[in-house]
Amino acid sequence: MPRARLIVNPSSGKDRGPDYLPGINEALRTRFGMMEIVMTTGARDGEAAAAQAARDGCDRVFVAGGDGTLNEVVNGLMAASALDRIPIGLLPLGTGNDFARMLCLSEEPGEALASLALERRVAVDVGTLNGRAFINASGGGFISEVTEAVDDRLKSIAGRLAFLIGGAHVMRDHESVAARVSLPADSFRPLSFEAEERRAEGEGWRTEGGRMVLETRLHMFAVCNAKQIGGGRLIAPHARIDDGWLDVCLVDEMPMLDFIGLLAKVAAGGSHLGDERVRYFRARELEMRFERPVKVNTDGELLEAAACDYCVLPGAARFLAGTDTSNS
């Protein structure tokens, strides 16, 4: 039985996943020997295929797809208790490919294959939301509303511009949400404008039973293992995938014109952290409670929840990476 498995999302790469498949298959077979190819056709097919690969004794799993397909594979290997045992090789064929950049993998298939052939293995942190794993980021509010507005057909036609189109569509009806955020005080690491005056009683954060607590209204939030979302939007510029922390970005309620300007700063490369209405900190675990169920996008997977419990699993996954991930 082949010792490696290739899981392919045929709708990735503007529906060009199958076009890349012969070259990918030949290159991987030359380097790693015979392997079975599994084509996904529906939600969580990648998860089932990855779990089956672990049960079949595979020692490598390759993923040809985007961040959503990768998320399914991570969850499948975690369910099979094989996440720290079987390395994942990512061939980034999606629209955003945000996590591939953290692994220093090219979006050009031939170059990515050359990097994977080096078999440089790295340990990578994994985040969880309500027990389900994510590898790149989990975001709610405006972020997830945009994701819901951007379907596969729009991504196939417009590529990364789809997220801008979706954002313009969502802006008209978007509303902020009341939120209660709490985390252990000993794992609170402020990184931007969390100065003493913002942590004072009644001015933001407060201490309550050994926990840091914040009650506010949010336009959006992102809990990040990696730096980027939405095809290169630098939401968490200080995040690393191997530091044992989640980087958290909370965007407080503000006038809509100000919010539009802030989104432009995110797109421009991380200057949003200079806005005092942005809270940026690190945490190992985090609880969020909302006045109503909010849409949450976790590596492309959408759900609605009024309670979100996050934690990090340090070094829980193994990946094949490019030549230099020192800044990832």
What are these language model-derived features?
Residues P18-Y20, V74-L77, R101-L103, E148, ...:
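Short amphipathic alpha-helical segments
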Residues M1-A64, N71:
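ATP/NTP phosphate-donor binding region
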Residues R31, T40, R55, M78-E197, ...:
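Catalytic core of DAGKc-family lipid kinases
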Residues G46, G68-V73, D98-F99, V124:
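Short glycine/serine/threonine-rich phosphate/pyrophosphate-binding segments
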Residues E208-G209, E215, L234, R240-L246, ...:
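ATP/nucleoside-binding phosphotransfer catalytic cores, i.e., glycine-rich phosphate-binding loops
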Residues G139, I143, A222-P237, L302:
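Glycine-rich phosphate/pyrophosphate-binding beta-alpha loops
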